């Protein structure tokens, strides 16, 4: 599971913008956001760089259980 959706929502960024920056289709990015598929590590690292967050923020919840 990843937290791409939460980070996008927090930053007010649209999936279409992220897809364009990644050079991937909206459908691919939507699959990542909806957790239907997981990005490869290098793609996850690229997403983190584009969103200006630590890659850990995309995979580890900051909420305490």
Locations of regions flagged by a protein language model:
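Short intrinsically disordered terminal tails
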Residues: 1, 64-65
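A short, Lys/Arg-rich alpha-helix, primarily the initiator
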Residues: 1-14
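DNA major-groove recognition helix of helix-turn-helix
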Residues: 8, 33, 51, 59-62
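Alpha-helical residues within the helix-turn-helix
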Residues: 9, 20, 49
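Short alpha-helical DNA-recognition segment
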Residues: 12-31
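DNA major-groove recognition helix of helix-turn-helix/homeodomain DNA-binding modules
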Residues: 42-57
């Amino acid at each position: 599971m990843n937290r791409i959706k939460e980070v996008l929502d927090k930053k007010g960024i649209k999936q279409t913008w992220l897809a364009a920056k990644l050079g991937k289709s909206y459908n691919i990015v939507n699959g990542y956001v909806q957790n239907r598929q997981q990005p490869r590590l290098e793609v996850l690292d690229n997403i983190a760089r584009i969103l200006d967050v630590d890659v850990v923020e995309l995979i580890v919840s900051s909420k305490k259980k």
